[in-house]
């Protein structure tokens, strides 16, 4: 799995947002109401194009058989709902297909009943087993530990067989 993600990361080279000129302009920071387009993509009012969460991959809707992609999208939507859909995103880069990659957080009570605090959506999706680390070789300059956090929680989630890991490891039928 790691080799697959590494090779895919090489194919999906990223260019820092400041250096990318032919992908259009997005604000460096975007805040507002958002909803889940897929397990790793957000859309918001007055936000074009949608933002992909930096550092992760989730099953793509329409590209994979079974309900894994729907479960990943539902997990992201549940996270957004718990934060009343209020999201804060910082643009990290554009990928070679000019998709905006962003680090996005919500303020929510996780676990339920705890004090509300900021949570990185990508880290939470990986921790819950609905996404895996991808393209971690160039972390955001403001969060040098972002790659390590995602890799750490991916390892824990995989070992615990959370979310979609039994399917990804071939231990269960397609969800």
Could you describe each region identified by the protein language model?
Residues 2-9:
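Sec-dependent signal peptide recognition
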Residues 9-11, 165:
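Enrichment for repetitive, rod-forming helical segments
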Residues 13-16:
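N-terminal signal peptide c-region/cleavage motif recognized by signal peptidases
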Residues 18-175:
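Small beta-barrel nucleic-acid-binding modules, primarily SNase/OB-fold domains
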């Amino acid at each position: 799995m790691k080799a697959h993600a590494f090779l895919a990361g090489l194919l999906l080279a990223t260019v820092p947002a400041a250096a990318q000129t032919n992908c259009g302009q997005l604000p460096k920071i975007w805040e507002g109401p958002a909803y889940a387009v897929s397990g790793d993509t957000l859309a918001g009012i007055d936000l074009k194009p949608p933002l992909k969460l930096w550092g992760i991959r989730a099953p793509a809707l329409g590209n994979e058989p079974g309900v894994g992609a729907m479960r990943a999208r539902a997990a992201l939507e549940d996270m957004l709902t718990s934060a009343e859909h209020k999201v804060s995103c910082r643009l990290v880069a554009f990928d070679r297909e000019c998709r905006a990659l962003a680090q996005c957080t919500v303020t929510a009570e996780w676990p339920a009943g705890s004090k509300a605090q900021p949570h990185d959506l990508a880290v939470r999706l990986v921790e819950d087993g609905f996404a895996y680390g991808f393209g971690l070789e160039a972390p955001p300059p403001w969060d040098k530990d972002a790659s390590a956090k995602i890799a750490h929680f991916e390892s824990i989630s995989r070992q615990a067989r959370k979310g979609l890991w039994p399917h990804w490891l071939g231990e269960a039928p397609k969800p």
